[in-house]
């Protein structure tokens, strides 16, 4: 049996290929998979249909709230202001655990001029595993997201603004 040694150039090339395969550098990174949680439909407070998939590829904020929640009431003016100041980010409020009239009164009271959904059966909340309100999901255009849930205090307008600004940075 005869053993044939590789030339230094071939040995170097083989080690580069082996290293690339070992560390996953052999191909361009795959595009991020779409977040299947966005595969939901809902109804706006005005009765129009809404498709969560319409948010894919866009910076977006999902805000989970109820009209009787003291922290949601404390956050609402800031959410309204931050949404108005960031027109390139889509805001969607997702209300649950109350009747439609209470939800509509909340939206009117705080001038929430963005889409708000009536999640009466809690199915969208369940899809995102929201245990209590208020909660947020911050989506970047690449589909990655951050879930924030603090049931013991309201998010400050400054923190919300900083998080929203980071979505488009």
Where are the language model's segments positioned?
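Secretory targeting and sorting signals
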Residues: 1-32
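N-terminal "domain-start" segment that seeds a small globular fold
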Residues: 22-52
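Short loop/turn microsegments at loop-to-beta-strand junctions
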Residues: 38, 60, 133-134
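Short active-site neighborhood of thiol/selenol oxidoreductases, capturing the structured segment around
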Residues: 51-73
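Hydrophobic beta-strand anchors of alpha/beta hydrolase catalytic cores
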Residues: 61-62, 91, 136
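Structural microenvironment flanking redox-active thiols in thiol-disulfide oxidoreductases
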Residues: 73-110, 120
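Thiol/disulfide oxidoreductase modules built on the thioredoxin-like
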Residues: 108-112, 120-166
